[in-house]
Swiss-Prot record:
GO terms (BP aspect): translation
Function in brief: Binds directly to 23S rRNA. Might be involved in E site tRNA release (Potential).
Family the entry assigns: Belongs to the universal ribosomal protein uL1 family.
PROSITE patterns xrefs: RIBOSOMAL_L1
Species of origin: Guillardia theta (Cryptophyte)
UniProt-listed CDD domains: Ribosomal_L1
GO molecular function, one term: rRNA binding
Pfam family, one: Ribosomal_L1
Principal localisation: plastid
Gene Ontology CC terms, in alphabetical order: chloroplast; large ribosomal subunit
SUPFAM superfamilies: Ribosomal protein L1
Listed name of the protein: Large ribosomal subunit protein uL1c
UniProt superkingdom: Eukaryota
């Protein structure tokens, strides 16, 4: 047996096929993160959504209270004073026509793209490049705004966008495996609360189907969703 497959087998053997309480699950997540890099902590949440209907789609943003653990590179499409404001607020890139042309040529050295409303006609042509990567600015995600300073500060602090995919599953990173269990729990609570708060109007009956967490290279660990609702973590 190779070293890699032996490692994976040993890690998987630590996980039982049952719903875990949050603190035990997060300790297991950290314990099973054995890759040679700092792994992300991921949540995969299956919801009872039929996303072909507009009133059963979920797409929104939230700010993780303990941040993402990732340095976010932000690009801003704006002109004049707004471009200067963006750089002063911590944007890594800022420009208008020149930046749009660079993106058209394949320059995607950023994690988030913000645009001022007057730039929307200019970036419409970027849909085919940015859309599949989830980088296209939109008012709903807070990435089309005149207040570029606040937007940059929020994303740098840990604001992220998430959506339910075609199968009704939300895939979201809620920190890094070198975070404390308490910090991971606070971030995971924020995820759960955001999903409940933004429950689509068309959903009837049971909303949550399953709730799993894992590290980037680790096994899935099932969580007991009722514990989050009761806020009684032990």
């Amino acid at each position: 047996m190779s070293k890699v497959s032996k490692r994976i087998s040993e890690v998987r053997n630590k996980i039982e096929n049952k719903p875990y309480k949050a603190i035990e699950a997060l300790n297991l997540l950290k314990d099973t993160a054995t890759a040679k890099f700092v792994e992300s902590a991921e949540a995969h949440i299956a919801l009872k959504l039929d996303t072909k209907y507009a009133d059963q789609q979920l797409r929104t943003t939230l700010v993780l209270p303990k941040g993402t653990g990732k340095k976010i590179r932000i690009a801003v499409i704006a002109e004049g004073e707004k471009a200067t404001e963006a750089i002063n607020a911590g944007a890594d890139l800022a420009g208008s026509t020149d930046l749009v042309q660079d993106i058209m040529k394949g320059m995607l050295d950023f994690d988030r793209l913000i645009a001022t409303p007057d730039m929307m006609p200019l970036i419409a042509k970027l849909g085919k490049v940015l859309g599949p990567r989830g980088l296209m600015p939109s008012p709903k995600s807070g990435t089309v705004t005149s207040d570029v300073k606040s937007a940059i500060e929020e994303f740098k602090k840990g604001k992220l966008e998430y959506r339910a995919d075609k199968s009704g599953i939300v895939h979201i990173s809620f920190g890094k495996t070198n975070f404390s269990v308490n910090d991971l729990l606070l971030n995971l609570e924020a995820v759960q609360e955001s999903i409940d708060k933004n429950r689509p109007a068309g959903v009837k009956g049971k909303y949550w189907k399953s709730f799993y967490i894992c590290s980037t290279m680790g096994p899935s660990i099932q969580l007991d969703i009722s514990e989050f609702r009761d806020k009684n973590f032990q």
